[in-house]
Structures are given as structure tokens and as C-alpha cells.
Amino acid sequence: MELDRWAQLGLVFLQLLLISSLPREYTVINEACPGAEWNIMCRECCEYDQIECLCPGKKEVVGYTIPCCRNEDNECDSCLIHPGCTIFENCKSCRNGSWGGTLDDFYVKGFYCAECRAGWYGGDCMRCGQVLRASKGQILLESYPLNAHCEWTIHARPGFIIQLRFGMLSLEFDYMCQYDYVEVRDGDNSDSPIIKRFCGNERPAPIRSTGSSLHVLFHSDGSKNFDGFHAVFEEITACSSSPCFHDGTCLLDTTGSFKCACLAGYTGQRCENLLEERNCSDLGGPVNGYKKITEGPGLLNERHVKIGTVVSFFCNGSYVLSGNEKRTCQQNGEWSGKQPVCMKACREPKISDLVRRRVLSMQVQSRETPLHQLYSTAFSKQKLQDASTKKPALPFGDLPPGYQHLHTQVQYECISPFYRRLGSSRRTCLRTGKWSGRAPSCIPICGKIESTPSPKTQGTRWPWQAAIYRRTSGVHDGGLHKGAWFLVCSGALVNERTVVVAAHCVTELGKATIIKTADLKVVLGKFYRDDDRDEKSIQNLRVSAIILHPNYDPILLDTDIAVLKLLDKARISTRVQPICLATTRDLSTSFQESHITVAGWNILADVRSPGFKNDTLHYGMVRVVDPMLCEEQHEDHGIPVSVTDNMFCASKDPSTPSDICTAETGGIAALSFPGRASPEPRWHLVGLVSWSYDKTCSNGLSTAFTKVLPFKDWIERNMK
């Protein structure tokens, strides 16, 4: 007992300490306040008087609330100020009762109304809207407060759509329906496509969704109240309303849409049209052509064809169809398209990518004959004008792509100044359906350079000079490692895909064994000996085939000539152009007295030499040496040689300065003289450096060249 007393005294002491620690106006907790929710609102003057609450517009007491605190003027505040006594205007009936022995939930839990008007729910009757999943039902909103917002989402079963009918509509009217309104959307949310927005009191027509859901939104603004609205909904199918006329069968598809299967004699989306027995009159064939039924049911009789018949048209000989190739007999008894005609025309000739064509504007051509001159002298000018020959009319009608009208002229030119045209520059479409003249083509201009070379001119570029590189198969004495490329010879470009070179450059030493094409490449547009100084404009081309002359002798180096076929076409430019091939008629008997230009790179140059970086393509003049004299020169040096008919010897011309040593550079030999294609001088390939025993470049021994002229036909056969 003593222990219990001391415990109670301890609790009282603790309570006094807690009270002394609170702020002044909250120092006393009024235990009479009904629950902790009220304590924060209660002052020391908290009263127990009951405050009566009334429903809006009514005088009878419908509820009470306590306590109510006094304000600064020591007056009891109105119950409407405190949220515990605010009763929503739309309550259908308010909760009755007084503060009794038990705690009423009138204020504390927020339940103010016992019953709400239809469509509203919640303790304050302010909540509305819901998700509806039913085959049928209703949406009823009895009256509505200010600033209300309600949403309903109606879901139907898959394969069904929703029909919504308004039984009553009483909202504030506005032409734009922007104050109080009901908005219906075709979907399940407020972002779905809107069907329509309604206001006022005029009931709308029934509304149908396209899918299985419908969204209904109600909104009211801050003024005026009306009676609300009432709508019923039900699940239906697109066929529920029997949309097909004349006993047509309504068929549903997977999307919920419908199609009507019409009975015989009816047509239309809903079988609403009576199908008349129609047909099309027979189409005649075009002049200089004929027709053929290619699809559909075909002829009804000799003069008519059935609906759905397709007729195709064709032309005879050199005539071309202008207009629709096919026409179809349509449901209305009319033919599709327009009747075509057969016209004389020419198919455009095929041209290469190097040829540019231009169709000239249509002009009717006429010719003056002796008869015209006779009339001009025998008759007066007036009579001549009256009796003048009428010029034919210009052709009409569109032609298929790739055809041109009669008398059309087409002009041709090469796409680049580095090419020259062969064939006609202008061709005319004749009445026979053929083109006048010869088909044009463009070939590269050969043997032309920007400036005439001279031994005194430094830096002359020879655009047909081809550098032949070979890939190493082992360690080279010069420090080249396996797989590195090194310059072995010079060749001559003779067309976009062909290079002529000495055969010993592309075979194993002393053998007729051809090296692999993968171990060979051709570089065009090269000028400097050092590969690092080459311009970006050079072209590195792969080799697709190596054609060795069948009579090549690897011991005597007789017939020392080969053709390289390029895998990729050379791009013709100022730096890359072919050289011409000379004919027997071009080379006169004065060939022995000719001054021949030889060009090539120093293939034996030392890469460590100070001048290697600036070393360029060398060239110089040589003169032809008599074959017997050439053999005697070598015999005097103890070197027996044979100069065959496929060779010629030449040595440096002492009368002209030169920087070339043919024994070190190899290279190609060329002559400049007017060719058959142009009176201007053109450079022609006449020889390839084959062999030389002049180790010191002292000109004591002549260099042997392979003659190109005897192999011209063989080269041209392999150029194709």
C-alpha cells in the first residue's frame, strides 16, 4: 500500500513538471474537450454550450457540435467558421443527434451527411464518378455544387461497343459549353478522342463508341446550379441496330466494326443501292494496234463486255502506245482511263556513262527543193503564200519512258574534255522508227600533254607513265621487309584498263613464270621517286590479269612485252591519260633518224641519298642505232648479243641535254607526230626498255628496246 501511494505521488509530480514546461496559453489541458483532435483548438475558455447547425435553406436543427471557442472579442465563433460544423450545401439530409455520453463522429471523422443526393457520395457528399463494368447501367447526377469535377469510365466486354442515351440534361447553357458541361470521349481516359461536349437542357442523340470503352466527364464552374443529368448505357454490337438494308447480313470483324453482305441485286456499304444490270460497250483497238481481253469475265456479246473485264492494248511494229495500257469496265458501266493511241516513235539508243545527251526542243524540219525555187519565180509572193506547203504538225501525246517522238533531235557530247567522241554528234528520230547517224561513244584522248616536253624543261609530267610495284617475298638488300612494295619498272597506260609493260618486269628472273597478280600493283599519276612525296591525286590500282606474249624468250629477252589488265578503271584527268599506239603507216622510213623520248624512274636509287626526296621522273632524248652497229659495240666489250627484229637499239643523243640513264631507269620510249584522229601532234608508244649492259651510263653501249609496233594488233586484242 505504501508503495502504491508513493507511485501515485510520483505521477502527479511528473504531470506538474510537464504542465510547467508548456507555453502559457496551453498550460492547462482541458480534459473536458472531447478528444485529442480538439485540444489544439481549445483555449482556456473552452465551453460546453451546444451550437446548433442547420442545413442550407432550412430552419430545423439538424445537428449540433461542441465545443466552440471564443474569439478575441470573447464571442463564440459561428459554427460555419470551424470545419467541424461546415455542412455541404448538397446534403439531402443531415445527421441528427446531440453530444452525448459517447464521442459523435460528426466532426472528428468528417462525416457530415447521413444521405447524399443521387450521384454523390462521401461524408461531405462532394465525391462523384466511378469505373463502371457492366452490360448496362446508368449515370445519375442529381443537382450539383459549384466547381464540381466528376469522371466516369465505362468498360464493355471485348467485341462490344457502348451506346449512351441521355434521359435528362439540365446544365447551364453556353454556345461554347465552357462553363457547366458533360464531355464524352471515345476511349478510357481524358486524352481519348472527344466525341462531343454537351450543355443546356436539350438532350443529344444516342452516342456510340468505336471501341469497348467510353469516358464521361462532368464539370461545373463557380456560379449557378442546375438539376444535373441522367444517362443510361448498354453494351451493344455494331450489328445490334441492324444497319444493313434490304435484308443484308451484318458481319462483325475483329475490331468491332461491321460489313454488310448484300443479297443479289444490291450494293453499297449498307446494301442501300439497287444494283442495275450494267455493262460496257466494246472498245475498238487503236489504229496501227490491237486490243486483247486479259482479265475478267470477258464479252457479254459482240458489242458489250461484262463488268470487271480488263482490256490491254498493243501496237504494231515500230509504233509505240501513248496512254493507258489497260482499261477496266467499271461498276457504273464506264471504262477507266482514256483510249490510247499508237504513235510512230524511236526507242532511245543506249549510251555509255561517258556520253552526255540532250534532247533538243521540238522543231518541225523542212527542206527547200528546186520546186520551191520554181514556184518562187513563177508566182507572185501572195500566191506563193497561199499555195505554200503546209508544215506537218508537231506530234502529240505522251510516250513511255525511253521513247522519243518523230523528228526529235538528240545531241551528244562527252562528259569530260579528256575524252573525244566517236559517232554522230546529233541524231534524228526518222519515220522508220530508227535513228539517223551512228551511235556515239567516248574514248579517252591519247598522247596529249599540257606542255610540249623539252630537255630544258624540268618537271614535265607524262600522264601515261605507269609505275609498276612488286611485293617482296623476303628480306631485301635495301632493307625492305617482307610484304613491302618496291618499284621495279615503268609501263604505259594505253586505255582505262590496260597497261603495256616489259615482260621481264612481271616474271621470275630468267624464267617465263608469271608472278601472282596479288603481288603486283600499278600506280598512276606518280611524279616523285619517293613514295612519301606522292600527291593525293595518285591512283593505286590492282591488277586482275597478266597477259604474257606467247613468244616471250626469257633468255634472249626477245618479244619482251606483256599486258596488265586492271581490276579497277583508271580515272582520266590532267595527270592520268593514255598514250597512242602507232601504226606502220604512222612510222615512216625515217624512224631510224627519229629522236625518241624515254621516260622512267631511277629504280636503283639509294633511299639514303640526300637527293632521293627530290628525285622525280627522268626523261631524255635518244637516237636509234643500227642493229649491226649495236651488236658490234657489245662484241668490242666482250658481250655477244643478238638484236632481233622485235628490238631496236638506241643511245643518248649527245646534241640534247638529258638526265636519264636507261640502264638504271628502264622506262618507255615515245615519239610525237600527228595522228589519224587529230592533226595536232600526239605522243605514240614505240618501245619499252628491255636490256642494257652499260653499268656506268657512259653511253659506250646502246640500250635495247622492245619494238611496240609489231605487237599493235596483239595489244589491241587484249585491250578489249
UniProtKB/Swiss-Prot annotation:
Entry keywords, A to Z: Disulfide bond, EGF-like domain, Glycoprotein, Repeat, Secreted, Serine protease homolog, Signal, Sushi
Induction summary: Down-regulated in dystrophin-mutant mdx muscle cell line.
Any one GO MF annotation of this record: calcium ion binding
Domain (Sushi): residue spans on this chain: 278-344, 387-444
Signal peptide as annotated in the record: 1-21
Superkingdom, natural source: Eukaryota
Principal cellular location given in the protein's record: secreted
Amino-acid biosynthesis as UniProt keyword: no
Domain spans labelled CUB: 128-236
Domain EGF-like: 235-272
PROSITE patterns in the record: CUB, EGF_1, EGF_2, EGF_3, SUSHI, TRYPSIN_DOM
A Pfam family hit: Sushi
GO CC terms of this entry: extracellular region
SUPFAM superfamilies: Complement control module/SCR domain, EGF/Laminin, Spermadhesin, CUB domain, Trypsin-like serine proteases
Disulfide pattern: 128-150, 177-199, 239-250, 244-260, 262-271, 280-329, 315-342, 414-442, 489-505, 630-649, 661-697
Coiled coil: none
Subcellular location: Secreted
Peptidase S1 domain residues: 445-720
Residues of this chain annotated as glycosylated in UniProt: 614
PANTHER family in UniProt: INACTIVE SERINE PROTEASE PAMR1, PROTHROMBIN
Similarity comment: family membership: Belongs to the peptidase S1 family.
Function: May play a role in regeneration of skeletal muscle.
Full protein name: Inactive serine protease PAMR1
The organism of origin for this protein: Mus musculus (Mouse)
